[in-house]
């Protein structure tokens, strides 16, 4: 009898957001905006959340659109890492 292993690839969460601060060394603050449908009023409610992400080469600047991915905790507040800069600020 053969045993088949059911292996699942656990995907890491990833977000696209706008850099709001790059003042810290190797750290950026990314604001991620989401829209959700309100159950009772059937209107879209927008909300935003800020994440601190690790930027190894200090490549991102304020206003850039970036993609961040979940990572093991790097410090008390940082558990996200910059993967790519999608669009530079004008």
From Swiss-Prot:
Which GO biological process entries does UniProt record here? translation
**Any Pfam family the entry gives:** Ribosomal_S17
GO cellular component annotations of the record: cytosolic small ribosomal subunit
CDD domains reported in the protein's UniProt record: Ribosomal_uS17
Give a yes or no for keyword RNA-binding in this entry. Answer: yes
Molecular function (GO) terms for this protein are: rRNA binding; structural constituent of ribosome
Asked if the record carries the keyword rRNA-binding, the reply is yes
Which keywords does this Swiss-Prot/TrEMBL entry list? Ribonucleoprotein, Ribosomal protein, RNA-binding, rRNA-binding
Cystine bridges: none
Sequence similarity: Belongs to the universal ribosomal protein uS17 family.
Quaternary structure note:
Part of the 30S ribosomal subunit.
So what does this one do? One of the primary rRNA binding proteins, it binds specifically to the 5'-end of 16S ribosomal RNA.
Name this polypeptide is given: Small ribosomal subunit protein uS17
**Which gene is transcribed and translated to give this protein?**
rpsQ
């Amino acid at each position: 009898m053969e045993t088949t292993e059911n292996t699942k690839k656990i995907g890491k969460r990833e977000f696209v957001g706008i850099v709001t601060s790059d003042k810290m060394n190797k750290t950026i603050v990314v604001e991620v905006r989401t829209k959700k449908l309100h159950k009772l009023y059937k209107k879209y409610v927008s909300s935003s959340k800020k994440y601190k992400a690790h930027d190894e080469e200090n490549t991102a600047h304020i206003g850039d659109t970036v993609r961040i991915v979940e990572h093991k905790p790097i410090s008390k507040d940082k558990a996200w890492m910059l993967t790519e800069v999608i669009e530079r600020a004008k």
